[in-house]
């Protein structure tokens, strides 16, 4: 794309327009600045609310992929890529899933998480190459993230995923973008002009984080990773999480702390299994077998 074409493209983007509410923000004091930022941030949940049907559809596709052995793969550049990596990295400790079940890829690789990598987002071929490096297949779901909706790196990845007949999702902040036209499901969280013109790490980034939270949380709930609203598959890998596992067992069963701790010990610190043991009266092996028959869904296992 020529410089002139790029300038014209940017001029048409909602995220690149100037915000009338912050036009003189450099004349304000600290309290006034943060008030404007906070006021603008209030528009973000509403923008995400308009996308709920598309988000729910994406969740259904992700769950179908998980049940068939597929993965959820996020890909993005800059802030968008970092948010994808962040959401993916939280899934193993929160839900006890393998680290490759939800994958985050950022343009420029690991170094780009902390340092800007010049030109990384401009290479569509690298987007495809990074998917090839993780052996992306038609069983997987690709979620491309870019506020602009035009990032070449992400577009390259989406086109490659489409060529494999994989499900593709685009999360953008500009309606009718190139990514929207490629993806099977378009989540267009249009938050309007940023407080600082073009700084899409702000409202656009916040909207992206809310959407990513929904995608993984809803998918994991449907996969049986929660009981009521408790994270029963949490990995008790540190002192805080071990204490949380005890509380989860106590809350789910209304048992004492001593019973929760003793049952967790017998259940190898598996909170879901411990809850099954307490509520069903079954021993570890039998409780585990019942859970397996119900694909790890505790509520269904208890209802048998």
Curated annotation (Swiss-Prot):
Domain SIS per the UniProt entry, residue ranges: 62-225
Enzyme class: lyase
Pathway, per record: Amino-sugar metabolism; 1,6-anhydro-N-acetylmuramate degradation; Amino-sugar metabolism; N-acetylmuramate degradation; Cell wall biogenesis; peptidoglycan recycling
A Gene Ontology biological process term: amino sugar catabolic process
Catalytic activity: N-acetyl-D-muramate 6-phosphate + H2O = N-acetyl-D-glucosamine 6-phosphate + (R)-lactate
EC number of this enzyme: 4.2.1.126
MF (Gene Ontology): carbohydrate derivative binding; carbon-oxygen lyase activity; ether hydrolase activity
Active-site residue numbers: 90, 121
The entry's keywords: Carbohydrate metabolism, Lyase
Subunit structure of this chain's protein: Homodimer.
Family that this chain belongs to: Belongs to the GCKR-like family. MurNAc-6-P etherase subfamily.
Further remark: A lyase-type mechanism (elimination/hydration) is suggested for the cleavage of the lactyl ether bond of MurNAc 6-phosphate, with the formation of an alpha,beta-unsaturated aldehyde intermediate with (E)-stereochemistry, followed by the syn addition of water to give product.
PANTHER family (UniProt xref): GLUCOKINASE REGULATORY PROTEIN
Function: Specifically catalyzes the cleavage of the D-lactyl ether substituent of MurNAc 6-phosphate, producing GlcNAc 6-phosphate and D-lactate. Together with AnmK, is also required for the utilization of anhydro-N-acetylmuramic acid (anhMurNAc) either imported from the medium or derived from its own cell wall murein, and thus plays a role in cell wall recycling.
Protein name: N-acetylmuramic acid 6-phosphate etherase
Lineage per the UniProt record: Bacteria, Pseudomonadati, Pseudomonadota, Gammaproteobacteria, Pasteurellales
Encoding gene per record: murQ
